[in-house]
Amino acid sequence: MLHYLESAVPAGHYLEAVRGKSDQYNGFNLVLGTVNELFWYSNRGDGTLRLSSGIHGASNHLINTPWPKVERAKMEINRVLTSKAELEPEDLFKVLIDRWQPPDERLPDTGVGLEWERILGPMFITSPVYGTRSSTVILVDRRDRVTFVERTYSSVPEQFHDAQYHFHLTA
């Protein structure tokens, strides 16, 4: 990633290079580009996707897979965006710590069994053996000022540490 950030290589070209090495890694989703053009790539899918304007969601599968937590996150983010004149990182972190449990009949069947599907069902996962460890919010305002906040959690969403960075995008 550092190579991409320090270079002038277009996002689509960089992702083609990543694609050539992607079998060396566990499953991942990668979103990169500029504020005007974003791309998504996963080594679980068939290729690179240029993202259209709007709200997209990704979990541990392909982008916009209609899992209940992905659909709920997209709906809640849309609600926040349409109800707030000034958006703060905390507005989005409140969405990301949602522990709503989908009913069993709405859970995906990813091959891990019902007990694990229940554990993995909420946006914010808490279990003694597996859970959400961090969430990131990136806001870019109309003046190209960026607020980047990564929140690292202990075992519960109420206990966390934020790393926050502010910078200005340049051409």
Task: Describe each region flagged by the PLM.
Residues 1-171:
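N-terminal nucleophile
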